[in-house]
Swiss-Prot record:
It comes from Nitratiruptor sp. (strain SB155-2). This is Diaminopimelate epimerase. Its main location: cytoplasm. Disulfide bonds: none annotated. One of its GO terms (cellular component) is cytosol. Catalyzes the stereoinversion of LL-2,6-diaminopimelate (L,L-DAP) to meso-diaminopimelate (meso-DAP), a precursor of L-lysine and an essential component of the bacterial peptidoglycan. Homodimer. It catalyses: (2S,6S)-2,6-diaminopimelate = meso-2,6-diaminopimelate. GO terms for molecular function: diaminopimelate epimerase activity. The lineage of its organism: Bacteria, Pseudomonadati, Campylobacterota, Epsilonproteobacteria, Nautiliales. Belongs to the diaminopimelate epimerase family.
Length: 250
């Protein structure tokens, strides 16, 4: 089987397509292992679908299946277009719902499923948090310095609320910074698309940023996010890192 490694805003993924739908939790752990496998934040498997260009299975590095991954959706869209599974404009099915994406060279824009505010009144460690679903649940707080990111606090909150944890900083009306602790990876990652989206959405709701902003994660790779007609879009570059072949995968 041909496997392709992609990077999107600092998140990396192993992607392939097949006709067989089955549980691939153990395969995800094997392929995503940083020392004994290819190494990635997640495994994406594309499958044919009767109504959409394709559907996907997305697995975190620990083998857990996730409803959605923002940067993963952009990598998957680029893969699908590059390997003839979809045109430049596509729709595909995730556990969170239908995702729309468009590809132009190495830049991909995805429209996320409709976001939901789950809780506005969380107080933890002297900080106010919001729980927001942008395909997967995210806790969001704002700080004056991203060095205030606390991995131990993030791990505790991730387990308490079963959510990803995001620290955001508002630099000005058009620029936001984010650091994210991701469940499934169980560590801080270089980027998280749905986390960046949740942080932007909360800032926009507060009226402290414009409807179109640049968001910068730990990787330093910029993403453009916009909120338009109650729809959330995000756009950025993706990179095909390499292709490889592995026997016994289907």
């Amino acid at each position: 089987m041909q496997l392709v490694k992609y990077s999107a805003s600092g998140n990396d993924f192993v992607i392939y397509h097949t006709f067989v739908k089955k549980d691939r939790s153990e395969l995800a752990k094997l392929l995503c292992h940083r020392h004994e496998g290819i190494g990635a934040d997640g495994l994406i498997v594309l499958l044919p679908h009767s109504r959409y260009d394709f559907e996907w299975q997305f697995y975190n590095a620990d083998g857990s299946e996730a409803e959605m991954c923002g940067n993963g959706s952009r990598a998957a869209a680029h893969y699908a277009y590059s390997y003839g599974l979809a045109s430049k404009q596509m729709r595909f099915l995730t556990l969170a719902g239908v995702i729309e994406a468009s590809v132009e060279a190495d830049v991909v824009e995805s429209q996320l499923t409709k976001p939901k505010i789950l809780d506005r009144k969380i107080e933890e460690n002297g900080k106010r948090w919001w729980l927001i679903d942008t395909g997967v649940p995210h806790l969001v707080t704002f700080v004056e310095d991203l060095n205030q990111f606390d991995k131990n606090e993030s791990k505790r909150l991730r387990n308490k609320y079963n959510a990803n944890v995001n620290y955001g900083i508002i630099r000005d009306l058009e620029n936001v910074g984010v650091r994210t602790y991701e469940r499934g990876v169980e560590d801080e990652t270089l980027a998280c698309g749905t986390g960046m989206a949740a942080t932007f959405l909360r800032a926009f709701e507060e009226g402290v940023v414009n409807p179109t902003v640049t968001v910068v994660p730990k990787s330093g790779e910029e993403l453009q996010l916009r909120y338009e007609n109650e729809k959330l879009f995000f756009k950025g570059r993706v990179k095909k890192v390499f292709e490889t072949f592995k026997e016994g995968i289907w």
